[in-house]
């Protein structure tokens, strides 16, 4: 499956960090009304709670697991949103402008975090982002759109030197005599 995050952070603000991630695990729960009524799924619930604790440890949020989502700094809220998406165990993780609103230090930490996700969880990450330094730093392949039209695809080095990309995003130099 696929999980995504949004440009604007979408957390359950009145819930703890732990509960924000646990609720995403409910997508994978095999309970029904009968098993819920008689608490027959207690083992599955205990397993999911343990998985959430492990995920929070891996993403660096274990120490704030009992904090409300709203009490976290912006960078950690973004990390929590990504952890919640990972809790659904997607094959593809879509990150929509994850660096939006971040300061340069948070953006550097985000780049490292995305690399860790790819390595530790073996996930394909589709990144939609306007921070070119971030994109060039972490992407294996880049697809560039100009008003919805694909104008280039390739490695970061190929994209940096692509004339169509340069024209579209830096503008074509006007002839001084015109």
Give the location of each predicted region.
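Glycine-rich phosphate-binding loops of nucleotide-dependent enzymes
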Residues: 2-178
